[in-house]
């Protein structure tokens, strides 16, 4: 039988094992953060304010009940020098990877940070459900911080229980690995562990609580330090009245900044002997990485639902997968967080929110930066973002040989057509590689007809567009604003969110039009829009071959670039939901199937290049199951309903009709 090498008490004690250590037990920990930054050594139990520290030690583990491995990511484990076989052969793996048993060399702790949440400073937040284990040196893959999400109460748990449930853990596990496979900087997820411990949750915010399984994700990143890590030094906020737990401790702020630059931006440290110059170069690099990151999000239709400063990585990673979503139909106003009633973190708002968060980071760094120079760097953000964005979009359209002034307008017009036709974002881009090269004089309509037919299959029906255009504002609130616009225009102009009202009115206008349009008429409009755009796209493609005779090479390059930048698979909500429902019944096979597809988002196949015998048969069976699962299809009808509310679409009511033209007048809108 397996001997038990580690005894857990409070404080945690470690005894030398007489057994041969497993691969997990041989991980080489360095734990630099705890050596270089102030650590709270208090043994006071429970949540509390933690001044003058960047971390708090976790003195007692809170084991899960009968933890068991649900899924492993071989590619994430490889970053630690581990294989899935190593982990599965370790009888204590589930305990180690859920924070139920301390790994040799690890030093459990929780990170202290603050944050601006939905635009307001929230004071001390911190790792309320996350336990830092340490930093592992893995040779060729460098150093990785590892932590367990869902490990129990920490000093930063506030009113929470420190647990994560199976539902949210599956989503984080799959999305972490999906983003990495897409080539987007992200934290990684090495394992998903579930258990027989249950907690009470209200998943629909309906007042109805249910019992859900506690689960844990082992996360990896070069660092989990975030913008909010520097906000613990913030003085009292004039609006919220809150302050950071280490307000005024400029010495610790300098220590944290030095640590981040030395460990994660060593090139900047080496290039600058002057501290202020070094810090400005650091801030510029953080700005650049953030701009590039959000550009990558936008180009795969990803939306981060809680884009607060505490969820912004200081090293430019996608961090903390709470509410998130990959768009199905393209909608610039797409909101993936049911709590985001005002759309602060909508798809189209994400770049400007990232810039806003960078401004809060500059404030937090204070005298470490030159204020005027920091503002100048912030002013470069949108141009930097737009350059990265257009560069990626050119690749998605196969425009790789030339950069034309018209390209930006071509992309904007494409998105406009996708929006008004309700086209599926991922599948439409994937189909554009089938647009024929403009090399003969045949009729445009005849030439592009087949690909237009394929794209039309990805467009929305009238009923789907009605759902899309339903006003997101509560009916009573909208009625009050509409009434105010008619009875007191001056108060309306002062008190209301004119932009938000205009967006709601635009939805009402589109909804009204849809009730006057039948499906056949809609399809004709959609076809005409796509034929017109594809005609413009082919004219632009023709410019790619100016000055060269090797048309075959150009075509080959175009297809190669497009197929490596337009994924076939993304983590759609229904894919995650199917995996969740199966897992809640004890079947983890769907998580593993989804992971296998998401690991190769640009590929039509999923297995190794060659396999023999039994492995080949298993791989073929797995590929057949993945193909049948239809991960590259539009979402099924049930998935197109809002996950939080049952949407019943009716024609615009009399109240909306009565005030529609009055408010259009006062907001300057027309349809």
Language model features: what each stretch is:
Residues 3-113, 118, 347-671:
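Regulatory N- and C-terminal appendages and interdomain linkers associated
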Residues 6, 10-295, 372-378, 558, ...:
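Phosphate/dinucleotide-binding and metal-coordinating scaffold of catalytic cores
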Residues 169, 199-202, 206-304, 315-423, ...:
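ATP-dependent phospho-/nucleotidyl transfer catalytic cores
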Residues 174-177, 197, 335, 341, ...:
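Short, surface-exposed, polar/charged, turn-prone segments marking secondary-structure boundaries
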Residues 182-187, 341-345, 613-614:
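Low-complexity, flexible helical/coil segments
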Residues 307-312:
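Hydrophobic residue at the +6 position relative to the catalytic HRD Asp in the kinase catalytic loop
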């Amino acid at each position: 039988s397996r001997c038990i090498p580690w005894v857990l008490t409070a404080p945690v004690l470690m005894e030398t094992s007489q057994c041969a250590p497993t691969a997990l037990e041989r991980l080489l920990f360095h734990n630099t953060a705890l050596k270089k930054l102030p650590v709270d050594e208090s043994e006071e139990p429970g949540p509390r304010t933690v001044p003058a520290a960047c971390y708090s030690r976790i003195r007692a583990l809170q084991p899960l009940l009968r933890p068991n491995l649900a899924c492993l990511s071989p590619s994430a484990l490889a970053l630690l020098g581990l294989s899935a076989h190593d982990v599965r052969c370790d009888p204590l793996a589930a305990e180690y990877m859920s924070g139920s048993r301390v790994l040799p060399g690890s030093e459990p702790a929780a990170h202290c940070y603050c944050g601006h949440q939905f635009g307001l400073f929230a004071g001390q937040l911190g790792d309320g459900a996350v336990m830092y284990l340490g930093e592992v040196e893995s040779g060729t893959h460098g150093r990785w911080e590892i932590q367990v999400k869902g490990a129990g109460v920490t000093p930063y748990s506030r009113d929470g229980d420190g647990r994560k449930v199976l539902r949210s853990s599956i989503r984080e596990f799959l999305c972490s690995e999906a983003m990495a496979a897409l080539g987007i900087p992200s934290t990684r997820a090495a394992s998903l562990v579930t258990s027989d411990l249950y907690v009470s949750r209200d998943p629909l915010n309906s007042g109805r609580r249910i019992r859900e399984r506690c689960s844990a994700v082992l996360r990896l990143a070069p660092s989990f330090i975030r913008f909010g890590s520097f906000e613990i030094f913030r003085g009292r906020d004039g609006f919220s009245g809150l302050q950071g737990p280490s307000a005024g401790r400029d010495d610790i702020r300098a220590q944290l900044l030095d640590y981040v630059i030395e460990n994660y931006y060593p090139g900047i440290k080496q290039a600058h002997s002057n501290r202020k110059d070094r810090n400005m170069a650091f801030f510029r690099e953080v700005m650049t990485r953030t701009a590039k990151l959000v550009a990558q999000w936008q180009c795969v239709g990803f939306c981060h639902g809680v884009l607060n400063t505490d969820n912004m990585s200081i090293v430019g990673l996608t961090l903390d997968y709470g509410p998130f979503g990959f768009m199905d139909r393209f909608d610039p106003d797409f909101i993936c967080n049911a709590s985001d009633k005002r759309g602060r973190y909508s798809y189209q708002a994400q770049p400007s929110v990232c810039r806003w968060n960078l401004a809060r980071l500059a404030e937090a760094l204070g005298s470490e930066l030159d204020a005027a120079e920091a503002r100048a760097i912030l002013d470069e953000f949108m141009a930097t973002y737009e350059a990265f964005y257009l560069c990626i979009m050119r690749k998605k359209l196969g425009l790789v040989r030339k950069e034309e002034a018209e390209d930006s307008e071509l992309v904007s017009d494409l998105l406009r057509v996708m929006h008004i036709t309700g086209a599926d974002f991922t599948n439409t881009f994937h189909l554009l590689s089938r647009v024929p090269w403009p090399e003969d004089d045949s009729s445009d309509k005849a030439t592009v007809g087949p690909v237009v037919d394929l794209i039309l299959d990805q467009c929305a029906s009238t009923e789907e567009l009605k759902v899309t255009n339903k006003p997101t504002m509560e009916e009573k609130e909208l009625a009050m604003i509409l009434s105010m616009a008619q009875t007191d225009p001056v108060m309306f102009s002062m008190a209301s969110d004119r932009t938000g009202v205009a967006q709601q009115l635009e939805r009402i206008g589109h909804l009204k039009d849809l009730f006057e349009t039948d499906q056949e008429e809609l399809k004709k409009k959609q076809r005409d829009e796509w034929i017109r755009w594809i005609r413009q796209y082919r004219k632009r493609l023709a410019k790619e071959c100016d000055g060269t005779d090797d048309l075959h090479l150009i075509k080959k390059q175009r297809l190669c670039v497009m197929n490596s930048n337009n994924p076939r698979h993304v983590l759609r909500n229904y894919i995650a939901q199917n995996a969740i429902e199966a897992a809640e019944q004890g079947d983890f096979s769907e998580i593993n199937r989804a992971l296998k597809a998401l690991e190769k988002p640009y590929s039509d196949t999923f297995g190794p290049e060659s396999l023999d015998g039994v492995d080949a048969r298993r791989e073929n069976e797995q590929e057949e199951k993945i193909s049948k699962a239809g991960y590259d299809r539009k979402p099924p009808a049930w998935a197109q309903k809002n996950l939080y509310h049952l949407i019943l679409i009716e024609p615009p009511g009399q109240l909306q009709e009565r005030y529609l033209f009055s408010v259009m007048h006062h907001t300057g809108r027309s349809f």
